[in-house]
Amino acid sequence: VGSWLEGGPSGEGDHGAGLGLAPSGPGSAAPLGRRALALVLDWTLSLLLASAFFSSSEGPFWERADPMVTLAVFAVENLLLVGTLGFTVGHRVLGLRVRRAGATPDGPLPDDGRAPGLGRAAVRTVLLCLVIPAVVWDSDGRGLHDRSAGTAIVRR
């Protein structure tokens, strides 16, 4: 018996098989519940930072921050942390990381454990901030932002 954070019902374990990801455990495709919760944590952190440092009004933190400033803080967090460390704060808390993923003529890219780099992180971040690419998935369970950047979110 698992929770929604552990992933979907059986039969969904083949997500990431085309990328050479493990079927379960570390290195396997991250379940949607964990990815969504990591996103909520990252957005909340961005909202807190934007309201603390870039607001001149009073009231609850979720009302003080300008939405575009919050989006900018979110984008900078994603770009720098994913590009250099391979995870955001939300990913780290939920045991996830972003890895390079894709195919070569010899098969799937091996996981070298390194962060995706700033170039891949920039593509991923721009598309993530546009929202629509992030909610359209391929057969491996990756959003179009990850597919376009050549990345995948996996369990640590």
Q: What are these language model-derived features?
A:
Residues 1-156:
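Membrane-interfacial and juxtamembrane segments of integral membrane proteins
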